[in-house]
């Protein structure tokens, strides 16, 4: 990642970097962006440090920190009288940070204990861990998985019969983009994320109609984050009438931007991470349907950021 980013900046003389999906890759990009003072917008990677210890005036994010979607689920579970939880996640940055966010929210809201189980990334052989969960008998399980690994876990958890006795919860990435793959095994699953089906705002309806017309599929959270990256860049360019040499003014405008997003309006924190609503969703049919707002206007704590 550093080598390719360096080529884009030094050889191709790009004005703006936009990327990426994976937190590990974004680490390499951040290094070059900071060294060269190149404007950078992160449309997905949730690495806490990107708008924490590694924050910089020229670094912006339009998605989330790994802490952010998981923290409110802690209070949701504690408020339901759940006291002892087993957490399970891939043993890598995103998994560790998501579990830390959930644990912080859970204990703060009155939860008693979170016992952490881990599996190497991207391993998806869950049988031994499911057996261990059954023997521990917690009040609930909280997990962080995404993509194909998430789909397999949801199906394996249901097949093991655990959902009948031990409720399963997760960060929204557990079910986003994989509802076709998990089918009946995902029905009723509750997750927290910064986007949901059934928001029913005028803005979201317009976005969904335009997206399905262009791509013949329903938009997910990744589509919204990418769209908002475009809105943020446009806000900066509008403020300087397209003159990208006016870097200081452009960055200031992006920091003050109010993004009229399909997920709901949001603003930038001082560390340049979205201050946004986090929704509690439930899988109903082929939707991650809105249940309620789990946390209104949640800002990441931006630990270590000196901006």
Can you say where each PLM-predicted feature lies in the sequence?
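Extracytosolic ligand-binding ectodomains
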Residues: 1-307
